[in-house]
């Protein structure tokens, strides 16, 4: 059984978030959180029973904030809010991401600045632990005021409304609650608003994209090293003195990864003597530390921004227990998430763009020195000709997907919400970009492995030969033309499973090694 994970509000590390997404451990809440939640809920209860009008507690919402709501209608107000805001469309968000949404929403509410009862936070974790996951449509949020529509669908499940997924089957929410040992919840003052106001959906989607890109990045470093060996490229561009003179942290770390992978290669030793004519390789080989280092820098920036956001309170209004104040602000505006996701999208697209160029180099015998299209009898066999076309198609698609979403904004709610972040789309499309990059890098892994085999009996480094064995365990050598699609799918699965992660240790928790 997976080891349980205790959520500490404000203390969710990137490793913890990654573990929730990939391993689905049982979740518990730090017991110290309960006093903070009770104190903030008491502040809200006092206001709800008083005479003062306070936004989100006894008023309408958005453009209707000036409407005062009678005490007898406060529960109906919260229920109406959820029902009216559950307007999402599109394919459901993936289960692993929904589980992450539940976890970071619970942790945010448990800080004790939202005025919500602890039993609702416990219910969110109970759903995750029972694998009863709200069906949340992926479209319908503009990333301010929070992820209203998708989080309303999440909240509907707590009310016994809508649908949930359990062990892959879609069930009515009421049945799902029973499986989780829960009953439909009646929301009190501010609780519905606290549940739907926040950036947890866009943050979880962006984190999910980051975790997929992280694996594609590791595989791309490996593929790039294999390509260097396949075309008998130079190892000199990875000399630490080159990167040190520039000083870019990501470049320094990526160059070190290449040295780790290439060190001790007999193949390289066989051709890197005084007679070697390899003076300068194409940029797609020689500039890998520079390009992939810049990508790594952006991944680290995104990781830091998203970790901060996952630990933040993005509700509105906020309950300050120490003073009894309820402050209206704009923490729900997901601009940090949108910009981080946009930069990550551009960076991930560059992984694929560079990999596609190396595939083109490998199949071009005039550059690579390998047989045309990496097949022994070209002409009779087409080899990797159209696999490269697929890579080019995916790389080109990513160029469109990488267009920044955060530069767009449409006013909503009768111009009350007159600038929005588009963070949810910015984050959601990362999954498509990551899938495309994984496909491209997978093709390069197969092409580079094929190219390397033309140099047998010479062998590469121990690490790269380990990678070769892993590849060939799933996909045999390409001798003559065969039905190719299953091979591409198999290598993409190998990347997605993280099988290459241990060979390419990538640390996103730091800004650099120096």
Swiss-Prot record:
> What is a single molecular function from GO for this protein?
histidine ammonia-lyase activity
Report the HAMAP family cross-referenced here: His_ammonia_lyase (MF_00229)
Q: Where in the cell is it found?
A: Cytoplasm
Cellular component terms per the entry's GO annotation: cytoplasm
> In this chain, where does the modification 2,3-didehydroalanine (Ser) occur?
145
InterPro entries under this entry?
Aromatic_Lyase (IPR001106), Fumarase/histidase_N (IPR024083), HutH (IPR005921), L-Aspartase-like (IPR008948)
In the Enzyme Commission scheme, what number(s) does this protein have?
Answer: 4.3.1.3
Family per record:
Belongs to the PAL/histidase family.
PANTHER family hit by this protein: HISTIDINE AMMONIA-LYASE
Keyword terms: Cytoplasm, Histidine metabolism, Lyase
Pathway membership, UniProt: Amino-acid degradation; L-histidine degradation into L-glutamate; N-formimidoyl-L-glutamate from L-histidine: step 1/3
Q: Where is this cross-link: 5-imidazolinone (Ala-Gly)?
A: 144-146
Catalysed reaction, written as an equation: L-histidine = trans-urocanate + NH4(+)
- In what way is this protein post-translationally modified? Contains an active site 4-methylidene-imidazol-5-one (MIO), which is formed autocatalytically by cyclization and dehydration of residues Ala-Ser-Gly.
GO BP term (any one):
L-histidine catabolic process to glutamate and formate
Instruction: From the Swiss-Prot or TrEMBL record, give the protein name.
Output: Histidine ammonia-lyase
Q: One Pfam annotation, family name?
A: Lyase_aromatic
């Amino acid at each position: 059984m997976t080891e349980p994970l205790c959520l500490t509000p404000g203390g969710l590390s990137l490793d913890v978030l990654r573990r929730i997404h990939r391993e689905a451990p049982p979740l518990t809440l730090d017991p110290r959180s309960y006093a903070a939640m009770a104190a903030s809920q008491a502040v809200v209860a006092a206001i709800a029973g008083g005479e003062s009008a306070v936004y989100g507690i006894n008023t309408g919402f958005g453009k209707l904030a000036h409407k005062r709501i009678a005490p007898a209608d406060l529960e109906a107000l919260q229920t109406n809010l959820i029902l009216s805001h559950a307007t999402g469309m599109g394919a459901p968000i993936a289960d692993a991401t929904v589980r992450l949404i539940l976890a970071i929403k619970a942790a945010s509410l448990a800080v004790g600045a939202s005025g919500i009862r602890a039993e609702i936070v416990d219910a969110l974790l109970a759903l995750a632990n029972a694998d009863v996951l709200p069906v949340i449509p992926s479209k319908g949020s503009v990333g301010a005021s929070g992820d209203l529509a998708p989080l309303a669908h999440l909240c509907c499940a707590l009310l016994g409304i809508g649908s949930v997924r359990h062990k892959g089957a879609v069930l009515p929410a009421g049945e799902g609650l029973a499986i989780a040992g829960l009953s439909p919840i009646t929301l009190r003052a501010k609780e519905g608003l606290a549940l739907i106001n926040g950036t947890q959906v866009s943050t979880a989607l962006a984190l999910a994209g980051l975790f997929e890109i992280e694996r594609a990045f590791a595989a791309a470093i490996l593929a790039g090293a294999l390509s260097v060996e396949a075309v008998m490229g130079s190892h000199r561009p990875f000399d630490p003195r080159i990167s040190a003179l520039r000083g870019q942290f990501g470049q320094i770390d990526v160059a070190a990864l290449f040295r780790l992978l290439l060190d001790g290669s007999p193949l390289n030793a066989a051709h890197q003597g005084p007679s070697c004519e390899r003076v300068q390789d194409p940029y797609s080989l020689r500039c890998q530390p520079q390009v992939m280092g810049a990508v790594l820098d952006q991944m680290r920036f995104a990781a830091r921004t998203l970790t901060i956001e996952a630990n933040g309170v993005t509700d509105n209004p906020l309950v300050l227990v120490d003073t009894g104040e309820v402050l209206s602000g704009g923490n729900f505006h997901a601009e940090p998430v949108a910009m981080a996701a946009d930069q990550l999208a551009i960076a991930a697209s560059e992984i694929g763009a560079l990999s596609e160029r190396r595939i083109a180099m490998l199949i071009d015998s005039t550059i690579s020195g390998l047989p045309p299209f990496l097949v022994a009898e070209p002409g009779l066999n087409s080899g990797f000709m159209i696999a490269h076309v697929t890579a080019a198609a995916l790389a080109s698609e990513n160029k469109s997907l990488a267009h920044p979403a955060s530069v767009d904004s449409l006013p909503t709610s009768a111009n009350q919400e007159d600038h929005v972040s588009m963070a949810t789309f910015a984050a959601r499309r990362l999954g498509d970009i990551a899938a495309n990059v994984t496909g491209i890098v997978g093709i390069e892994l197969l092409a580079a492995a094929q190219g390397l085999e033309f140099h047998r009996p010479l062998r590469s480094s121990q690490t790269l030969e380990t990678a070769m064995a892993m590849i060939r365990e799933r996909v045999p050598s390409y001798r003559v033309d065969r039905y190719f699609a299953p091979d591409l799918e198999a290598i993409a699965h190998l990347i997605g499973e993280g099988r290459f992660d241990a060979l390419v240790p990538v640390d996103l928790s730091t800004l650099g090694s120096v």
